[in-house]
Curated annotation (Swiss-Prot):
This is Lipoprotein-releasing system ATP-binding protein LolD. Pfam families: ABC_tran. The gene is lolD. It is a peripheral membrane protein. It is found in: Cell inner membrane. One of its GO terms (molecular function) is transmembrane transporter activity. Belongs to the ABC transporter superfamily. Lipoprotein translocase (TC 3.A.1.125) family. Keywords: ATP-binding, Cell inner membrane, Cell membrane, Membrane, Nucleotide-binding, Translocase, Transport. InterPro entries: AAA+_ATPase, ABC_transporter-like_ATP-bd, ABC_transporter-like_CS, ABC_transpr_LolD-like, LolD_lipo_ATP-bd, MacB-like_ATP-bd, P-loop_NTPase. Gene3D superfamilies: P-loop containing nucleotide triphosphate hydrolases (3.40.50.300). It comes from the Bacteria. Residues 6-230 form the ABC transporter domain.
Amino acid sequence: MNDVVLSCKNVSKKYTEFKTDIAILKDVNLEIKKGEKVAILGLSGSGKTTLLNVLGGLDKCSAGEVYLMGERFDNQSVNKRAKMRNKHLGFIYQLHHLLPEFTAIENVMIPLAITKKYTKKESIKLANEILKKVGLDHRADHKPAELSGGERQRVAIARALVTNPNCILADEPTGNLDSQRSESIFALMQQLSDDFGTSFVIVTHDEKLASRMNKIYRLVDGELELVINSN
């Protein structure tokens, strides 16, 4: 049985500025298996976010192939990519991107509304369950301004997980948090990965936190290198 959730083969990405090609990614190969926790390290501007966007179908590669759940992903139409993304992927960002006028539970319910598969009653139940998993069911009716930074990020994690995706792509999810809250968020993501069997790909600059992952890669000058494989 093929347990590869997300992969890319010989992926390159370049931009053209003033008639000059600038290579961001160079022949990147990566394979994410079910339940794996993978960290990608790199300096600012090394292409980490670009790689995450290409893997998530938010940006197109200049060359190479991306596969999601065994199906070619990068060459699909915009609508097909969106459907595949909504079904199989969740996203967490450095900035929580919660809607300020919505409560925690309403923010978590947004992905469920996009799928159009659940009644409001079902959505409330699912959102409450995942908020309980991240320890915030008692804050369900609070708006983002009434939550701490760590609590907002927990809501963002709940929102990413509520549709039970196969893989979470997280871009510097603890970048705006202090070390204690960062440790707590990383521990939570590890626990949720174990509980749900969800794969996590986490872009971070924090080597200490990255050391918690099964695999650690480093992106240097657009090339991805495997640093540690503890599987």
